[in-house]
């Protein structure tokens, strides 16, 4: 997944899917 080949694509995807990005952030750093 994180091959580091095209981070720009991942960044764009995250930007398009803000919800997914938030979910990932919550998974890594849950606001509890």
Curated annotation (Swiss-Prot):
Cofactor section: [3Fe-4S] cluster; [4Fe-4S] cluster
Subcellular localization: Periplasm
GO cellular component: periplasmic space
Enzyme class: oxidoreductase
Reactions that this protein is recorded to catalyse: 2 Fe(III)-[cytochrome c3] + H2 = 2 Fe(II)-[cytochrome c3] + 2 H(+)
Cofactor note: Binds 1 [3Fe-4S] cluster. Binds 2 [4Fe-4S] clusters.
InterPro entries: NiFe_Hase_small_N_sf
One of the record's GO molecular function terms: 3 iron, 4 sulfur cluster binding
Annotated [4Fe-4S] cluster binding sites: 17, 20
Known EC number: 1.12.2.1
Highest taxon listed in the record's lineage: Bacteria
Keyword set, alphabetical order: 3Fe-4S, 4Fe-4S, Iron, Iron-sulfur, Metal-binding, Oxidoreductase, Periplasm
UniProt keyword Metal-binding, yes or no: yes
Complexes and interactors: Heterodimer of a large and a small subunit.
Family to which this protein belongs: Belongs to the [NiFe]/[NiFeSe] hydrogenase small subunit family.
Name under which the protein is recorded: Periplasmic [NiFe] hydrogenase small subunit
Species of provenance: Desulfovibrio multispirans
Gene: hydA
